């Protein structure tokens, strides 16, 4: 799972994530980090100081993130990334759009399945509580 996430960032497949690659992924998620912010993010986990993130460093970062469980605000922000029209629901189309931007080509069945798994009230979309 983490390897898959890592390869979403590592666009050229060379085994490292550069500030450029990090920026590309963040922009595809609707964020707009500055060069300095990207560098800070990399520096936080760049144990060997070579200016890029390799897979072991990525795992360290993920472990840190998971321990420091996402704040309400981070979860809300993530929800907003998916909820393109800001109507309070994530539709199959919105989910597909974000996943495609991340380079994840999903079939309609896979998207519907993801929605079904999260959709507790059965209305065919995902609200904030379900998210």
Curated annotation (Swiss-Prot):
Ca(2+) 2 binds at residues 46, 48, 50, 52, 57. GO terms for cellular component: centrosome; cytoplasm; myelin sheath. It comes from the Eukaryota. The keyword DNA repair does not apply. InterPro entries: CALM/Myosin/TropC-like, EF-hand-dom_pair, EF_Hand_1_Ca_BS, EF_hand_dom. GO terms for molecular function: calcium ion binding. Ca(2+) 3 binds at residues 83, 85, 87, 89, 94. Ca(2+) 4 binds at residues 119, 121, 123, 125, 130. Residues 1-32, 33-68, 70-105, 106-131 form the EF-hand domain. Ca(2+) 1 binds at residues 10, 12, 14, 16, 21. SMART domains: EFh. The keyword Ubl conjugation does not apply. Keywords: Calcium, Metal-binding, Repeat. Belongs to the calmodulin family. PANTHER family: CALMODULIN LIKE 3 (PTHR23048:SF0), MYOSIN LIGHT CHAIN 1, 3 (PTHR23048). This is Neo-calmodulin. It comes from Gallus gallus.
């Amino acid at each position: 799972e983490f390897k898959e996430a890592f390869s979403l960032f590592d666009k050229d497949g060379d085994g490292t994530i550069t500030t450029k690659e990090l920026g590309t992924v963040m922009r595809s998620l609707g964020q707009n980090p500055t060069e300095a912010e990207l560098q800070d993010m990399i520096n936080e986990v760049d144990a060997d100081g070579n200016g890029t993130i390799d897979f072991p460093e990525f795992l360290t970062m993920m472990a840190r993130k998971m321990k420091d469980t996402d704040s309400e605000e981070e979860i809300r922000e993530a929800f907003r990334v998916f909820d393109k029209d800001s109507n309070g629901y994530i539709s199959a189309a919105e989910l597909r759009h974000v996943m495609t931007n991340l380079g994840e080509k999903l079939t309609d069945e896979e998207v519907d399945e993801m929605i079904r798994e999260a959709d507790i009230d059965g209305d065919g979309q995902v609200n904030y509580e379900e998210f």
